[in-house]
Amino acid sequence: MTTTTTQAPEARALRDLADLASLGHLPGLVRQLQGLGGCTNPIRLDGHRTEHPIDTTTGELGPAVRHLAASDLPAGHLLVRCNNRRATRCAACAETYRRDTYQLITAGLKGGKGTPEQVATHPRVFATFTAPSSGPVHNRPASGRCRCGTQHPADTPELGTPLDPDTYDYETAVLWNAHASKIWARFTIYLRREVAKRAGLTQREFAEHARVSFAKVAEYQRRGAVHFHAVIRLDGPDGGDTPPPHWASAELLTDAIRAAARVASAPGPVLHGRAYTFMFGTQLDVRPIRSADFAGGTELTDRAVAAYIAKYATKGAETTTGTLDRPLKFLAELAQLRISEHARRMIRTAWILGARPELEDLRLRAWAHMLGFRGHFSTKTRRYSTTLGALRQARADWRRAQSESTVPADSTAAEDTTLVLAHWTYAGVGLSRGEEWLSAAHAPATGLEGATA
């Protein structure tokens, strides 16, 4: 019985492929799926797209030179990548997101993608900001033994779980996650003030001499608390295009970061007679990006930092804490889920707090699966480097150029004299078993850019 259940999906895939082959659709479907880059959860669209040339002298609309109808495509629909960054939801799209994040971070460290190469000479640091403690948890200290008396192996599921769940402050842990993005926003304000203070400048004068640029990602620790990894850079007043002032240094930047992290705070609610104020934890790590120790004796290089940050860009709470990668509809769903008891308590706490009127703006029930955190996992300042949107557009332009290279030049109207009429409607999501198998066969390989960091 077990064998039949295991082979059932493969049998359905083979039947789908056989049907497509008998209709003569298989070669065309392969070409259509290749454009998804291995995405197994694409958006399906119904509709059409028509191109008409325009006479630039009379403005007259000519007959259609191209027409694309979704129903004429091998899959019966136009298929669009889901672009989900979560590796647990779509490994192929998450891998593309990781590579794009790697390129984005790298461009801000050594130039490229429209960012000047001189940024490599600007003061740059790699900083990690953590959450405060909500109670003792199982860990692997330098002494080798946890406070519970056990020497835990690196892969034990107990790591990050409370020594005493009944006294662990789950409410504070969830509320800190919910306010983490606000703390970061306050930190960036204080950082500019602290840098200006050390340079002997006022806030207004600082803007005329220098600019702080950064890129950061959020990561969950095993205890379920969010912390931030960030590349922070000191530029001239116009960003990476201008050299930083003579007083700018990695040492000054490091000192300013530590000072700003100590005072940055976000006001919280009043619960059970307790007024909350949230700040970063005391464990703050700031390292200049140059020939310095990073981890295990390796150098803190541009490539290592970019790979380290990109690695976490595709992970959510489900990867580290064993929780969910989708929102809950009902709290009763928890009873059926195979998740850790610690994650279950964090989710339940967020759900219960979400019912309180004074916490309505935090939308804790909508973000219970994220343990309260509702911020963006990857953010950056405008002048740090290129954008993910620009990288996606460059990739789309390249694919379009490749597809049009086989079309005779005189058969296509110039882009600026063509009217495009398009109408698309949502038709569903996902692939059939056969389509899924073919798409997975064209997924991008992992373990390339910076994957070893």
Residue locations for each model-derived region?
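Long, low-complexity, charged/polar intrinsically disordered accessory regions
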Residues: 1-89, 95-98, 280-453
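Long, contiguous juxta-domain segments that are non-catalytic but functionally important
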Residues: 74-124, 129, 134-145
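Catalytic micro-motifs at enzyme active sites that drive phosphoryl/nucleotidyl and oxygen chemistry
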Residues: 75-79, 112-117, 200-222
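Histidine-centered divalent-metal-coordination microenvironment in nucleic-acid enzymes
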Residues: 90, 127, 205-239, 309
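A solvent-exposed, charged loop/short amphipathic helix patch at secondary-structure junctions
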Residues: 139-175
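A short, contiguous, amphipathic alpha-helix enriched in charged residues
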Residues: 177-209
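Mobile, glycine-rich extracellular loop/lid and propeptide segments
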Residues: 193, 213-215, 221, 241-245, ...
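Helical (often loop-to-helix) elements that flank the catalytic cores of nucleotide-handling enzymes
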Residues: 231-273
